[in-house]
Amino acid sequence: MSTPHIVVGVSGGVDSSVAAWKLAQQGEPIAGLFMQNWADDGSGDCRAEDDRRDAVAVCGVLGMPFHFRDFSGEYWSGVFEHFLAEYAAGRTPNPDVLCNREVKFKHFLDAAQALGAERIATGHYAQVAHRGGRWRLLRGADRDKDQSYFLHQLGQSQLAATLFPIGDLEKSTLRRIARDAGLPTHAKKDSTGICFIGERDFREFLGRYLPARTGEIRDPQGQRIAEHPGVFYFTLGQREGLNIGGVRGRAAAPWYVVGKDVASNVLYVDQDRDSPLLQSRWLQSEQAHWVTGAPPARRFSCTAQTRYRQPDEPCTVDVQDDGSVQVHFERPQRAVTPGQSLVLYDGKECLGGAVIAATDAPLERQLAGSSFSSEVVA
């Protein structure tokens, strides 16, 4: 068996299948590596075995060796423990970002290099370019499927060793390629949601690890209107799952989460979807990561996303002495959520990003006791 030049992360999905197929057409020695990131907990909801069988089948069709590695321990300590800690603190984390940084482009990359590979390839919708002496992370050609948001924590050494073979494809084209190539995953449904939760009920799953504590749901004036099953089950702007029935003297309209007081275990809601309590013009981040190793300048203009698939929002970024950033948006943003990722762009190029620490949304700022000043950025 020849040493593979490239190890492909085969997930059992159609995207990684076509990534492997494209590389196979080039004639270089390749191998597939399937990684298991979550141990079967006996719930019957784990899709890992089905995905592994599909990955084996794809490798068979393409005539490339199949390898398996169990990273469930690394995932638990590097991703899941952080996920639980963030929810316990009342924040809403993004485990996919951390998984890419801590597992897929760290432990997986190490495993591939141990097999003798020079580079790895994955089925992400993103692109890499080398310009100005630095590796650049670019959006995928399919804007609806672009995954650069989840890859913004990657650095130079990782990008230098990574290929994104499907980054220049539209999803519809990719499906057609998979069908014409006879890949067994060509009609497989895309996976959605948090990988380790799958199709399970989110509250039931989270309740296994974080004991729920019921508390009051209040309106912005502090009047009690209902009871919640646990404050960490909810995120800013959320409508579903509140189970607020008819409230005397209130319109029969939906309610939206506008604030969480973790210390008092109180959830605040409003019937205005675009409530002023959800609006923010500024945010403060934790320490930022820059794909090229440094920010473009101490202060610069660019666009930002504060959640996946959000339209680009023009903003001004001020880099702080501690490595964090403060961001001023040109227009108010709805439900910017601490714990989620701020990702910055210059056109198609992903500059980097950071975890959102605080915003100037009125209620969240009051509940957090934040010292963040909206006057910092003019």
Curated annotation (Swiss-Prot):
One of its GO terms (biological process) is tRNA wobble position uridine thiolation. It holds the Pfam family tRNA_Me_trans_C. InterPro entries: MnmA-like, MnmA-like_C, MnmA-like_central, MnmA-like_central_sf, Rossmann-like_a/b/a_fold. CDD domains: MnmA_TRMU-like (cd01998). Disulfide bonds join 99-195. Its main location: cytoplasm. Its EC number is 2.8.1.13. GO terms for molecular function: ATP binding; tRNA binding; tRNA-uridine 2-sulfurtransferase activity. Gene3D superfamilies: Adenine nucleotide alpha hydrolases-like domains (2.30.30.280), HUPs (3.40.50.620), Translation factors (2.40.30.10). Keywords: ATP-binding, Cytoplasm, Disulfide bond, Nucleotide-binding, RNA-binding, Transferase, tRNA processing, tRNA-binding. One of its GO terms (cellular component) is cytoplasm. It catalyses: S-sulfanyl-L-cysteinyl-[protein] + uridine(34) in tRNA + AH2 + ATP = 2-thiouridine(34) in tRNA + L-cysteinyl-[protein] + A + AMP + diphosphate + H(+). Residues 145-147, 307-308 are annotated as: Interaction with tRNA. The record marks 124, 340 as: Interaction with tRNA. It is found in: Cytoplasm. ATP binds at residues 9-16, 35, 123. Residues 94-96 are annotated as: Interaction with target base in tRNA. The active site is at residues 99, 195. It is an enzyme of class 2 (transferase). Catalyzes the 2-thiolation of uridine at the wobble position (U34) of tRNA, leading to the formation of s(2)U34. Belongs to the MnmA/TRMU family. This is tRNA-specific 2-thiouridylase MnmA. It comes from Xanthomonas oryzae pv. oryzae (strain KACC10331 / KXO85).
